[in-house]
Amino acid sequence: MLTIGCHLSTTKGYAAMGETARSIGANTFAFFTRNPRGGSAKALDLDDVAGLQHILDEGGFGRLVAHAPYTYNPCSAKERAREFALEAMAEDLQRMEALPGQLYNFHPGAHVGQGVDAGIELIVDALCHVMFEGQRTCVLLETMAGKGTEVGRTFEELARIIEGVASRRPELAGTDMLGVCLDTCHISDGGYDIVDDLDGVMAEFDRVVGLERLQAVHINDSKNPRGAHKDRHEVIGGGYLGNPELGGGEHVLRAIVTHPALCELPFVLETPHDDLAGYAGEIAYLRGLAG
């Protein structure tokens, strides 16, 4: 059965997220490690976390995908912004130890005019600083759309980050500690043709990064055509991936959820819905396509 869910709010606690996930047919989900605008994190209630762990074990959930706030920019041109990202990421990873074996996804950041090479070096520095030997959380670099000066649009850029960590801190670079989250909207907006050549794109990922690094999928439709570098998510079937009137179609979505390189990974929806019913419908629909 396809492992799929959506972003859920931590407002009512960890166990409540698990109950909500079950209520909409999800067997994984994503959550922000703190307010998505950044700032301090709530104190952990370990009994609440244990309650979630019980739900995960009892319900046969796949791995969860914790998401760092969008405000983190470990390759910012501003030193204080970099320091904030490092401090918060380090704290996030320590807190994730209360829920071992899960995934921690973050946007690599934007170099803001320093250049891609400088941005990659700063991201490598950040990972070498915040990760620690023996951690039980796998850190994921998210594929980006290439908006502005974002780092991580190409598979080559992601590979360079991973290789940089492996060169400096090989004990932190195992596939159980450092990987990639593939966002379908982002890679399409970034220029990869997953509508007509998904097999070719996945073969390229394997050649450049290695499929063993791929740990999760953000499954989103896109409001923009391939190569737009916009990063504007659309509901499933409403955009350039799933809408036949825009050159996509159901066959594209089916190919994604059944692809041998993807089908066993946790899928997370980040589509624009106002209520959980929209996500429940997409979960059921995509699970039906997966067979």
Each language-model region and where it sits:
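Short, electropositive alpha-helical surface patch
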Residues: R80-L93, V116-H129, T154-G164, D199-A203, ...
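Acidic (Asp/Glu)-rich catalytic clusters
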Residues: E19-G25, D45-V65, A90-P100, C128-Q135, ...
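N-terminal pre-domain/capping segments
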Residues: M1-A68, Y72, S76-E91
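Active-site acidic/histidine proton-transfer and metal-coordination neighborhood
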Residues: E58, P74-G179
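Acidic/histidine-rich catalytic cores of soluble enzymes
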Residues: F29, H129-I236
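Active-site beta-loop-alpha junctions enriched in small/polar residues
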Residues: H7-T11, R34-P36, P69-T71, G109-H111, ...
